[in-house]
Amino acid sequence: MLRESFHPEPTKILPDPDSLVRKFVRPGMYLHLANTMSRPNALIYALARVFGGTKPDFTISVAGLHSSAHALALSQIVKKVITGFAGDNYPKPGPNSLYQDLLMGKPFELELWSLLTLIQRLMAGAMRLPGIITNSLIGSDLIADKLGKSAFLYNKPLSGNPFGPAPEPHLSTENKGSRNKDIVFLLPLNPEITLVHGVVADEDGNIVLCPPSGEGPWGALAAQKGVIATVEKIVPRGALPPELVVIPGGKVLGITVAKFGAHPQSLRVHGLQDLPAFEGVETYMDDYEFQKEANQSAGIPAKADRWYKEFVSLAGGHSEYLEQLGSVRLRRLTMTPPEHNLRVPEDPKTVNDSEQMIILAARAIMEKIKTHSYKTILAGIGAAHMAAWTASKLLEKDGIKISVVSELGFYGMKPFRGDVFLFSQLHTKECSMLSDVPSILGTIVPDECLGVIGAAEVDWFGNINSVIDSNGKFLVGSGGANDIVSTSNTIVVAKANRHRFVRNVKHVTSPGERVVEAVCQFGRFKRQEFSNHPFELASWIPPSSDEEMETWEAVRRYTQWLPPDEDIPTPAEPPITVSELTILRELDPERIYTEQFMVYTHLP
């Protein structure tokens, strides 16, 4: 007798995001929110509307919680979040008071990973593997609460021993692992349903995503039950070029049209407007004003309540949301603004501490590129990426081309002057490649890449903290920082004060083995990678805010590190030049990163 064959139900097309959520999502589910550069924000709002006030106790995994995703906490629908970042990422990265008690389980339980390890677990889940090996987490406090549960340390295998080495005592006594002895094995993640916002889908549920694609399709492919998705447009069967389909219809439970379904985040459309499938679908940019309002409102109960009522708990759902935003605002998001140009050279005598720090970091990057065989620069968000951009432009003047990359999939980026957001779609225009997080953090960064990142705290052995402040409050998490320092030599860019340049960090979010330089407003501290030596001040320039300050005085006033020997003069940095300052200010005309005392001022 022939076995009855299994035919999955056809993808259902529903009228709106709320209907999609009602049809497929049930209380208590584990849901994943795909961070593809176009987070499914219309579906996040729909979750809040449909389940708000019902205590559904969802477990949510998502690469980052910021801006409109604050609705998850405000709606009280989440029991636990698995993430790599929670806070604000625009206009500058920093904590949001909505999450200050996260480490105490409020407003939900937290399971904190690095960006790459979260996606690697989804990759293992998608491939139905028992687990995956990672270069990240070893030596950091991020691994401590996961050992024996979702992360496991094993001795590195030895050639000629088919059964592997015998366990060693350090595996039970060193709770962070040792890079030269151990490997980390991570268990897979398999959400029940993954929520996606795509560019276009056909009536069978085949979905097109467009790079740079963040986590890519992995969260969708890891889903046990399948995917529910909003898209900008649904086209007939057979209308999509198969080479553009990223998520196959067999994985998709239901779809609906939600124009601007990623708002306030951006969506990029392939440059294929001549294809009928893409007709009427336009790239749109991040809505920075909306993101700022969401971030500023979230941590203040009265403002948060007003914001939530105005944009989330709308009886008319997504259609009413678009009406609230207005057609003029939405149309403006589809337009490319003019690039900023400075016609008059800047006077270096007007440089401030923030600008001086960024320029010193740019010099550090240039020196490393000229003296080592680095192929790329990984720009972490913040003053770090401003330094990387400035360095790349200065290197170009010297006839040296170096590719700047960022973790969400930008390769060979040339910044659009005037837009300082690291992940703006405007920076894709001249990229040489657009890819995803596994490609950048998993393959480009380990291959002769120079990392440049920020820090809330850095100690004199290079260890970095971005998780907990001096009062026990939550900061932001690792993001991709742990993944970067785990495989590449790294420069830290941070304005020095005694609460930031410390003897011992409160949480080793990113271990300091490969952190080779710390740059601040008055100089550059250096150390050798994989050494036991602390940072030493290697070059010096008086802070612009106090040009009479002595070297030893600056180190004692702004750090908890040992000052240099007064009998051995510290090499002086050359004065800031017209070219350096003009390039930097041209990149940041609104002075978001270059205003005096404005770099990470709200971190401890």
Cite the ranges covered by each PLM segment.
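Glycine-rich phosphate-binding "P-loop"
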Residues: 2-10, 31-33, 342-357
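Solvent-exposed adhesion/ligand-recognition segments of exported proteins
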Residues: 60, 64-68
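Glycine-rich phosphate/diphosphate-binding loops that line cofactor/substrate pockets in enzymes
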Residues: 16-30, 360-374
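Conserved phosphate- and dinucleotide-binding cores of soluble alpha/beta proteins
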Residues: 8-22, 38-50, 68-80, 84-346, ...
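Short glycine-rich or small-residue beta-strand-to-loop segments that form or flank ligand, phosphate
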Residues: 30-34, 82, 376-378
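Active-site pocket-lining segments that scaffold enzyme catalytic pockets across diverse folds
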Residues: 369, 375-384
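Anionic-ligand anchoring segments at beta-strand to alpha-helix junctions in alpha/beta enzyme folds, i.e.
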Residues: 145, 378-379, 387-430
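Generic beta-strand/beta-sheet core signal
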Residues: 34, 210, 230, 378-381, ...
